[in-house]
């Protein structure tokens, strides 16, 4: 880990927390991202950031003040593990299917959700036999509007000291980082070529990202950086800074791009107040960088350490997720610097080859001189 000892820029923290709250107060599940997407688009309209949807409902936000510059893509997803309502059994009884990855032990009788729309409280009654991840729930009262999905009944957003707690840090924190970075670059009038990408249905197999990659919706020469919250694992520490994610459970990401991120981060440590970073392979899950990489895009990743991953709390109880505000603010500060450093990609990534060539020259000389017959 690398760290500066001074305090972080307060404006980044304020922007990050404000965006995180706006997004996290919206209910979302795979295929039901309307509220989070609407809030993201509303922010873009408020600040004059050009945004559009593709035919699959993924959001593209573009800040292009340097058209000849290599595009930088910042990718996050709008959904979080949740339930789809499959059918109604009675005035207050519903069958719900869970979409996402959570261990079976967490689906206990009495587990509470909120049916959407309407935020109607409901409790898990039983697991349906022979039906994978399907459960019967009973609502506290008969919903006035037919529900179509449900989310865990947890606090939406709470700021406690330096931590954001809420139902869906994953990956609305990533979405907040995308938008905060674009806004920061816009305020600086930076000459950058950045595409913010907010995809759908990541929790059920990167479905939004796969449609984007397969449709060729991004420039092939782009550098794609996946932004995530990732399960805290040994070797990284919450509050220790943004994590340069060199790989995930399925893939190792582009070496030169990871080196570029580290070079920019190292420069930022030297000049920034309170910036810190860590470097690790985060194998707790698979992120969208794997999907983009498999379709031929040069990909890298950043993440922050996540507590209660996918709402999996202690003692097999559903609980709010949490992240460090300092880590997320550091992610945004790094991304702002990365976007502005894109013209120096070759120079920064060329440092290692140049060092190795210097070592090679010395090696040839020293080895020849010390050769014993």
Q: Residue spans of the language-model regions?
A:
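N-terminal hydrophobic/helix-forming segments and targeting peptides
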Residues: 1-373
């Amino acid at each position: 880990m690398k760290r500066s000892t001074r305090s972080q820029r307060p404006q980044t923290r304020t922007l990050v927390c404000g965006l995180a709250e706006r997004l996290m107060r919206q209910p979302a599940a795979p295929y039901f991202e309307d509220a989070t997407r609407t809030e993201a688009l509303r922010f873009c309209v408020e600040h004059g950031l050009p945004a559009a949807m593709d035919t699959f409902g993924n959001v593209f936000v573009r800040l292009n003040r340097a058209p000849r510059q290599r595009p930088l893509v910042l990718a996050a997803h709008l959904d979080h593990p949740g339930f789809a309502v499959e059918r109604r059994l009675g005035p207050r009884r519903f069958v719900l299917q869970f979409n996402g990855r959570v261990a079976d032990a967490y689906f206990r009788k009495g587990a509470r959700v909120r049916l959407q729309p309407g935020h109607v409280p409901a409790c898990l009654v039983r697991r349906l036999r022979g039906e994978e991840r399907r459960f019967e729930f009973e609502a506290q009262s008969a919903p006035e509007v037919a529900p179509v999905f449900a989310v865990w009944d947890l606090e939406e957003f709470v700021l406690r000291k330096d931590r954001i707690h809420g139902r869906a840090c994953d990956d609305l924190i990533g979405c907040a980082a995308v938008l905060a970075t674009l806004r920061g670059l816009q305020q600086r009038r930076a000459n950058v070529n950045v595409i913010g990408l907010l995809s759908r249905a990541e929790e059920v197999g990167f479905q939004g990202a796969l449609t984007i990659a397969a449709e060729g919706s991004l420039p092939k020469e782009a550098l794609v950086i996946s932004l995530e919250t990732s399960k805290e694992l040994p070797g990284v520490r919450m509050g220790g800074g943004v994590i340069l994610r060199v790989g995930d459970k399925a893939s190792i990401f582009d070496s030169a791009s990871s080196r570029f991120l580290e070079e920019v981060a190292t420069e930022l440590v030297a000049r920034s107040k309170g910036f810190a970073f860590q470097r690790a392979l985060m194998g707790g899950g698979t992120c969208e960088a794997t999907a983009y990489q498999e379709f031929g895009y040069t990909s890298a990743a950043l993440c922050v350490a996540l507590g209660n991953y996918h709402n999996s709390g202690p003692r097999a109880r559903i609980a709010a997720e949490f992240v460090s505000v300092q880590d997320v603010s550091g992610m945004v500060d790094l991304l702002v610097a990365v976007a502005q450093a894109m013209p120096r990609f070759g120079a920064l990534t060329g440092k290692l080859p140049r060092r190795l060539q210097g070592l090679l020259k010395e090696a040839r000389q020293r080895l020849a001189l010390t050769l014993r017959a």
